[in-house]
Regions:
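A short, exposed helix-loop element centered on a Lys and neighboring polar residues
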Residues: 117-118
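Conserved NAD(P)H cofactor-binding loop of Rossmann-fold oxidoreductase domains
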Residues: 85-90
């Protein structure tokens, strides 16, 4: 049976590499990130290289409505592996960083990650199993 893998933060860095690895393994992919153009380019790359079937679901995970929309769209879908990878960091002195950008970071790195984790945990319990990997790393941003 072909496994379905949902990857958030799939358009770059660690998420893109997860997509490439799972595509090489013959998995069906659901790719989520903010930039639809990058997701489309990645889906084309993976289809050309491996014949991978990719579903593209662009979303801004800082927006609760986008998180809710993703959950609604995927409610009936069997997802075997969930890579909860979306995230970013704001660097600099607390006195100098933009408070709105920091709030956006908390929404993506904490609130959305928790919301999607809970959604997938319930889905996987209902379907009889699955795998969730929560990724929290700044390694993809460092030289």
């Amino acid at each position: 049976m072909t496994k379905t893998v949902w990857i958030t933060g799939a358009s770059s860095g660690i998420g893109r590499e997860f997509a490439r690895r799972y595509a090489a393994m013959g998995c069906r992919l659901i790719l989520t990130a903010r930039r639809a153009d990058r997701l489309t380019a990645l889906a084309e790359e993976l289809n050309d290289a491996h014949g991978t079937v990719c579903r593209i679901l662009p979303a801004d995970l800082a927006d609760r409505a986008d998180c809710d929309r993703l959950c609604a769209e995927l409610a009936g879908e069997r997802i075997d592996i969930f890579i909860n990878n979306a995230g970013f960091g704001v660097c600099g002195s607390l006195l100098e960083t933009d408070p709105a950008k920091e709030e956006e970071m908390v929404q993506v790195n904490v609130a959305a990650m928790r919301r999607l984790f809970q959604f997938m945990l319930r889905r996987m319990q209902a379907q009889g199993g699955g795998t969730i990997l929560n990724v929290a790393s700044s390694a993809g941003l460092l030289p």
